[in-house]
């Protein structure tokens, strides 16, 4: 049995094409220890100056200490997971702010990455990630969602990342059905190889 961390970030709930893919992947991974964190239904605090001080400095106030405890909890979940399922829909060419906040809280110097003479080095190695993306249009792999997810995951040491796309969902019901079927087939292939 494997530990699986699932991150949902779509604001569209059950109507979300990305969430439908995430739910499908979770169903295929039953029998594992699965933790689901819905960043839209249970949003993290906005990563502001207080949060930055809390996770990168010396927390002094009660609020700073609470934010550090939250960061520690998120990082512990991440460290314990062998596999991550991340729902990353495209909103205005980028990931949802809820997902960006998550990465702001878990990207911590000397905890999930360290600075070296050769540049930053990620400390969370050996994890597998499946990123599930629904796009209204058709995009190549140079899109900002894919590039950001590769970059931020690599920054913390995670390089075994596979992407599953449901593209063209903005073209109507037939396109949605086709995109979902194609994405689910890809999920089946990836899960079978885990």
From Swiss-Prot:
Domain of life where this protein originates: Bacteria
Subunit relationships: Homodimer.
Sequence similarity: Belongs to the azoreductase type 1 family.
Keyword Transmembrane helix: no
SUPFAM superfamilies linked to this entry: Flavoproteins
Positions annotated to bind FMN: 10, 90-93
Gene name of the record: azoR
Entry's EC annotation: 1.6.5.-, 1.7.1.17
Protein name per its UniProtKB record: FMN-dependent NADH:quinone oxidoreductase
Keywords: Flavoprotein, FMN, NAD, Oxidoreductase
Reaction(s) catalysed by this chain's protein: 2 a quinone + NADH + H(+) = 2 a 1,4-benzosemiquinone + NAD(+); N,N-dimethyl-1,4-phenylenediamine + anthranilate + 2 NAD(+) = 2-(4-dimethylaminophenyl)diazenylbenzoate + 2 NADH + 2 H(+)
Function: Quinone reductase that provides resistance to thiol-specific stress caused by electrophilic quinones. Also exhibits azoreductase activity. Catalyzes the reductive cleavage of the azo bond in aromatic azo compounds to the corresponding amines.
The keyword Flavoprotein is assigned to this record: yes
PANTHER family, A to Z: FMN-DEPENDENT NADH-AZOREDUCTASE 1, FMN-DEPENDENT NADH:QUINONE OXIDOREDUCTASE
Essential cofactor(s): FMN
InterPro entries: Flavodoxin_fold (IPR003680), Flavoprotein-like_sf (IPR029039), FMN-dep_NADH:Q_OxRdtase_AzoR1 (IPR050104), NADH:quinone_OxRdtase_FMN_depd (IPR023048)
Protein species of origin: Haemophilus influenzae (strain PittGG)
Cofactor binding mode and count: Binds 1 FMN per subunit.
Gene Ontology MF, one: oxidoreductase activity, acting on NAD(P)H as acceptor
